[in-house]
């Protein structure tokens, strides 16, 4: 509670499903960021739908109805996953990463979206898209989400029909078109690390320019 009497909830960030237990023990009032890229790392192939479903639903159950914000695959930049065969780029932080990669590799993306839709039946899960720059990216992601819903319905599988979908605001472009993004998103999360880095053109890991960061 702030001095002015405003109550602020304290959420935890997690990288793996098992991390949720530490969050609960330490009194987290929700999960503000589940970094799902860690599910894809240190292995030879992408996790399947059922494996992802188990991971996401276990976190939702452990949080007992409290908010769980799950970020879709945020690959690229400094997050290299060998079997995804992303071509080497001159500047990977400005290249094919995060939502850009997922929208180009829709089958991989849909596996994750299907797992999230199914897992959301077991708690208060919300989906968050990383590195969004344009409203078109959100619209395309929502279209894929609707495709997944139709597929799950046809297969007779249970899923949450009204799942919330938001974005990470972590580029100057997203800030400039925030009003338009708000019209197609259910919520915003401010990604201060990348937003500061892109705004100041400064690498937070570079001591020579750390004064800018």
Task: Give residue spans per PLM region.
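Conserved alpha/beta-domain cores
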Residues: 2-213
